[in-house]
Amino acid sequence: QGVBGBEEGLFGGR
């Protein structure tokens, strides 16, 4: 679910 810079989850991401 988007951790750090993965997708768009916990810390926003992308």
Swiss-Prot record:
Where in the chain are disulfide-linked cysteines found?
none
Q: Just give the chief location class.
A: secreted
Q: Tell me where in or outside the cell this protein is found.
A: Secreted
Q: Which UniProt keywords apply?
A: Adaptive immunity, Blood coagulation, Coiled coil, Disulfide bond, Hemostasis, Immunity, Innate immunity, Pyrrolidone carboxylic acid, Secreted
PTM per UniProt? Conversion of fibrinogen to fibrin is triggered by thrombin, which cleaves fibrinopeptides A and B from alpha and beta chains, and thus exposes the N-terminal polymerization sites responsible for the formation of the soft clot.
**Regions that span the bilayer:** none
**Signal peptide range:** none
Q: Name one GO cellular component term.
A: extracellular region
Query: What is written about domains in the entry's comments?
Result: A long coiled coil structure formed by 3 polypeptide chains connects the central nodule to the C-terminal domains (distal nodules). The long C-terminal ends of the alpha chains fold back, contributing a fourth strand to the coiled coil structure.
Protein's job: Cleaved by the protease thrombin to yield monomers which, together with fibrinogen alpha (FGA) and fibrinogen gamma (FGG), polymerize to form an insoluble fibrin matrix. Fibrin has a major function in hemostasis as one of the primary components of blood clots. In addition, functions during the early stages of wound repair to stabilize the lesion and guide cell migration during re-epithelialization. Was originally thought to be essential for platelet aggregation, based on in vitro studies using anticoagulated blood.
Q: This protein is called what? A: Fibrinogen beta chain
| Organism per entry | Mandrillus leucophaeus
This protein's encoding gene: FGB
